């Protein structure tokens, strides 16, 4: 599975995913901010340092619009139109199995309203309304990013909202009617818990990078040490499957312009993981 992160590719890319049977989580393009910048405390430092904020920070008031870089009404209108257009344009590709709406609070606003609207446009695919943090208790996933803490499954706190709340009611009625009990790992047992970003371990390959210094997580004396660290964090994620983890997305397939945490180099000429 690939998560196409905050960008849309050409039709050719999706054609090849369709042809190969690759599953794609498609992100909406992020926007908002002031001159392309977000409030570093709200969208990065606070959720990194204080995990308890993830389920408590709203996104549907003027105050929160400003904090999340979504205070411009023209931006909010344009983002909504663009997100709808993405679903219309790409909805015919069977490779796409999830729509991701907001990432790490960047320009996030009214995530539950957005999830309801996209669900009405395409009821066939699950929706990751808020990937990373600032969960609004809606959409089909409880979706977190975890780069700095031991990997674990967090309980789904708070009453669910929107179409998934209606699904939960029906689910409970069916369970009562069938006279059986399910003991879910998450509190509600309706939304899937996913770690939608983790890892991000950096390794520079000289002459195959767009930047000269590594941006990513961890420092390794050799590429063998880096490979061992990648295997370890992947094994930690896989071990959570038996406890209810529904999926995970390692960061990332390749180095990009300012990051050296890919499994492939920026020019795609070196597979760092190949021994």
What are these regions (language model features)?
Residues 80-81, 95-99, 155-275:
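Substrate-binding clefts and catalytic carboxylate motifs of secreted carbohydrate-active enzymes
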């Amino acid at each position: 599975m690939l998560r196409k992160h905050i960008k849309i590719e050409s039709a050719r890319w999706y054609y090849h995913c369709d042809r190969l049977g690759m599953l794609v989580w498609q992100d909406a393009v992020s926007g908002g901010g002031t001159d392309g910048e977000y409030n570093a405390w709200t969208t990065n430092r606070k959720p990194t340092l204080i995990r308890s904020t993830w389920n408590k920070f709203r996104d549907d008031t003027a105050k929160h619009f400003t904090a999340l870089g979504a205070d411009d009404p023209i931006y909010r209108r344009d983002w909504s139109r663009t997100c709808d257009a993405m679903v219309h344009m790409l909805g015919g590709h069977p490779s796409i199995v999830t729509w991701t709406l907001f990432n790490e609070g960047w320009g996030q606003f009214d995530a539950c309203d957005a999830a309801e609207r996209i669900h009405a446009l395409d009821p066939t695919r699950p929706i990751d309304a808020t990937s990373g943090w600032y969960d609004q208790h809606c959409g089909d996933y409880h979706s977190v990013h975890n780069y700095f803490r031991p990997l674990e499954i967090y309980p789904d706190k708070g009453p669910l909202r929107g179409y998934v709340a209606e699904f939960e009611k029906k689910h409970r009625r069916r369970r009562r009617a069938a006279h059986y009990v399910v003991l879910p790992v998450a509190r509600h047992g309706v939304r899937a818990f996913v770690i939608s970003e983790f890892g991000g371990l950096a390794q520079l390959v000289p002459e195959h990078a767009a930047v000269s210094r590594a941006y990513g997580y961890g420092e390794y004396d050799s590429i063998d040490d880096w490979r061992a660290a990648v295997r370890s964090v992947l094994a930690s994620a896989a071990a959570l499957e038996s406890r209810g983890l529904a999926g995970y997305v390692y960061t990332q397939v390749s180095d990009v312009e300012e990051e050296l945490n890919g499994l492939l180099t920026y020019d795609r000429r070196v597979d760092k993981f190949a021994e």
